[in-house]
Structure formats: structure tokens, C-alpha cells
A protein has these predicted regions:
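One-carbon transfer enzymes
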Residues: 1-114
Length: 114
């Protein structure tokens, strides 16, 4: 990881992949979910490992979606998406180093599958 960067992981579903990574010794600096049920279920686990964990719903407007990521991330951060069921705006993809562990919202956008 780059000096001065942090690992930020996003998930929309259960967070089981992040939990598995943590159990194997990998520690994101910050985890964000837009799923309130998963937040409530996982917050004790992440707190035990001293990992910052935020529930942060995503706004509907594309303009606010770019702002959403900009308020969370710094230019040197490494971002991983783990079942993040949101399309990340192109501007955001260009600004940050993002790795998508799973395809996007393939239920509503099957053309993204692959």
C-alpha cells in the first residue's frame, strides 16, 4: 500500500467476504456499508478488531454520488468493493484506485455481469 494511504472497503450485502479476510489477518482501515441490517449485525465484530465501520446510505443523484465518495476518500487510498451494489461514477473511478471484487448491480444491470 502507498505511504499515507488507507484501505477502504465497501459492501452492500452481508459483509461475509470482508469478515473472512479479517479472520485471515487482513485489516481494512475503514469499512463502509449502505445496508443498515448488515451494519447492525457486523458492528460488534469490526469494533472487536478496532476497524472503523460506517453505515452510510448512498444518495440517488449522480452529482451527490461523486460527492459521497469524495467526502470519504483521499487520493492515495486503496478502495475495494465487495458486493457493492452501486455503480461507481466514472469521475470517481478516475480519481481513486478501486478494485471491484464482484461485478456491479447485476440484478438490475445484467449487461455488467462478466
Amino acid at each position: 500500500m502507498q505511504v499515507g494511504s488507507k484501505w477502504v472497503a465497501f459492501f452492500s450485502q452481508t459483509g461475509s467476504e470482508i469478515v473472512s479476510l479479517i479472520k485471515k489477518g487482513y485489516r481494512p482501515d475503514l469499512i463502509i456499508t449502505d445496508n443498515k441490517e448488515s451494519y447492525d449485525e457486523r458492528k460488534t465484530f469490526f469494533k472487536y478488531f478496532n476497524i472503523e465501520f460506517w453505515y452510510r446510505p448512498l444518495p440517488k443523484s449522480i452529482n451527490y454520488k461523486v460527492q459521497y465518495y469524495d467526502e470519504i476518500l483521499n487520493s492515495k487510498d486503496i478502495v475495494t468493493l465487495h458486493g457493492w451494489l452501486n455503480i461507481v461514477p466514472a469521475d470517481t473511478c478516475e480519481r481513486y484506485t478501486i478494485y471491484n471484487g464482484h461485478p456491479g448491480h447485476i440484478v438490475n444491470y445484467p449487461e455488467l455481469k462478466g
